[in-house]
Amino acid sequence: MKVLLVNGSSKANGNTARALAEVAEQLNVEGIDTEVFQLGAKPIRDCIGCGLCGKLGGRCTFDDDVVNELIAAAEQADGFVFGSPVYYAHPSGRILSALDRAFYAGGHAF
């Protein structure tokens, strides 16, 4: 079994990363493989609902950020943990945009 831990913070070594590392450690103790996926600090586009992902085999037409990499990593995972800093009672915009596009384009992987 493999669990993908998605870090929705732009800070690779911030509090969200520490929390995900704790989760990964406990999963590893239970014999579960883990992979941490860092969304990074670069901008992530919003989904525009163009529908081209249906013609691209479950990949988003925007190929200039990490969303297609996230979909590819999700295809190899059996479970997910999503981590995000909380800004004004919401997860980061970065993780929301990434998940909107990943679920729309690559929903089969989730």
Identify the residue ranges that each predicted region occupies.
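N-terminal beta1-alpha1 ligand-phosphate binding loop
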Residues: 2-32
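Glycine-/small-residue-rich active-site loops that bind phosphorylated ligands and cofactors
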Residues: 11-12, 42, 87-90
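Short, glycine/charged-enriched secondary-structure capping and boundary segments
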Residues: 18-21, 49-52, 94-98
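A short beta-strand-loop structural module common to alpha/beta enzyme folds
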Residues: 32-43
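Cysteine-centered iron-sulfur cluster-binding motifs in ferredoxin-type domains/subunits
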Residues: 7-8, 12-14, 45-54, 78
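Helix-loop-strand module that forms the ligand-binding subsite of alpha/beta enzymes
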Residues: 61-110
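Cysteine-cluster motifs in flexible loop/terminal segments that predominantly coordinate metals
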Residues: 42-74
